[in-house]
Amino acid sequence: MKNIVVLGSTGSIGVSSLDVIDKLGAGYGVLALSANTNADLLIKQMLKFKPRFVAVLNEDSYQKVKPYVPENTKLLPPDEDSLIFLASLPSADLIINGLVGAVGFMPLVTAIKNGKTIALANKEPIVMAGKSIMEECYRWKATILPVDSEPSAIFQCLQGTPAGRKEEDISRLLLTASGGPFFKYKGALSRVKPEAALAHPRWVMGKKITIDSATLMNKGFETIEIMHLFNVSLSDIEIVIHPQSIIHSAVEFKDGSILAQLSQPDMRLPIQYAVTYPNRMPSPVKKLTVKDMAKLEFAAPDFKKFPCLELALWSAQKEGAFPAVLSAADEIAVDAYLKEKILFTDIPKLIYSVLKETRSPSGKITISEAAEFDVWAREKAREFLANKKYKKTII
């Protein structure tokens, strides 16, 4: 039996993960669940999967869940220490980190220090302190299995390459992006409302990552993530807009050969690969047909139209604290946009305003430094929101 902890079980990744586990059936069990505010869904999940542990971070949701806890399930206190506890459970064989934003940082670090295998959808911790986190992975013999479709595609394409030769054999990583809902949009992006930005043409995801996909910040985050997961430089990665989301990414090797991973755009497939790794099992995901692949489009990203991507690549090149600041400022900006406090086009302005104020050490930063810069950047972003200084920013 593979015992699985699902952090963020009521979010998009968590719901898909539980669907995968349910359909796999025998041999896969849910050891623990965590959620924040969606008490109703958590209650349903808890009663169906009967986990040994449940964590609810939000106090009101905690009180709502409490009467429904099964006899053999332990409800943990409503705080982030409970996430740390779940990430370090000795009996956990796999930790699925489907948390959103920096809240997943310390649970990831904890799981790594306990030598766990982590199915990682929460890319922000790698963005914040990728070099230090990967060093901890090697030190504690932990394993990170990428769950996002594009990093998972690259991971799968590299499975036939001997571990010691991966970096030596790679010529280029082709990182695909759908382009989001505004790839061909001709109108003024400043007028775009959250409901339009949340209408992703290919993927069903949580609100934060869907807005990041609309601004292309998500692709910038994935670029930074891929640099660290596969130990490649920024110059080794080429971002390609591919609206159909059939080719999830590709690897070009030194001899000119290109291996790509193709499938329907359904997050259950990369999740299942991480859950069953290194094995493959039958999946409920619809199979590709030749007709599906008849018309595949490709284009270069438009950095002028989507400045968030350029900010992310700039931060990746600068290294130090800049990626951590980028991640934190983006989280504040996206939240403000979803609450209609700022315009869609204000998102990169607010992020850039915070990046300009950053005084970063050169090179690698430690895990504790990343956490400190995360706090600082959030405070600075909120300050700019309050005084509206970001409005005058020209990118």
Curated annotation (Swiss-Prot):
State the similarity comment: Belongs to the DXR family.
Q: Where does 1-deoxy-D-xylulose 5-phosphate bind?
A: K123, S149, E150, S178, H200, S213, N218, K219, E222
Q: What is this protein called?
A: 1-deoxy-D-xylulose 5-phosphate reductoisomerase
Binding residues for NADPH, per the UniProt record? T10, G11, S12, I13, N38, N122, E124, G206
> What keywords would UniProt list here?
Isoprene biosynthesis, Manganese, Metal-binding, NADP, Oxidoreductase
Binding positions (Mn(2+)) = D148, E150, E222
Q: Required co-factor?
A: Mg(2+); Mn(2+)
Question: What is catalysed by this protein?
Answer: 2-C-methyl-D-erythritol 4-phosphate + NADP(+) = 1-deoxy-D-xylulose 5-phosphate + NADPH + H(+)
Which pathway is recorded for this entry?
Answer: Isoprenoid biosynthesis; isopentenyl diphosphate biosynthesis via DXP pathway; isopentenyl diphosphate from 1-deoxy-D-xylulose 5-phosphate: step 1/6
Its GO biological process terms? isopentenyl diphosphate biosynthetic process, methylerythritol 4-phosphate pathway involved in terpenoid biosynthetic process
Which function does this protein serve?
Catalyzes the NADPH-dependent rearrangement and reduction of 1-deoxy-D-xylulose-5-phosphate (DXP) to 2-C-methyl-D-erythritol 4-phosphate (MEP).
Recorded E.C. number(s)?
1.1.1.267
Q: List the InterPro entries.
A: DXP_reductoisomerase (IPR003821), DXP_reductoisomerase_C (IPR013644), DXP_reductoisomerase_N (IPR013512), DXPR_C (IPR026877), DXPR_C_sf (IPR036169), NAD(P)-bd_dom_sf (IPR036291)
Q: Which GO terms describe its molecular function?
A: 1-deoxy-D-xylulose-5-phosphate reductoisomerase activity; manganese ion binding; NADPH binding
**Enzyme class name:** oxidoreductase
- On the tree of life, the source organism's domain of life is Bacteria
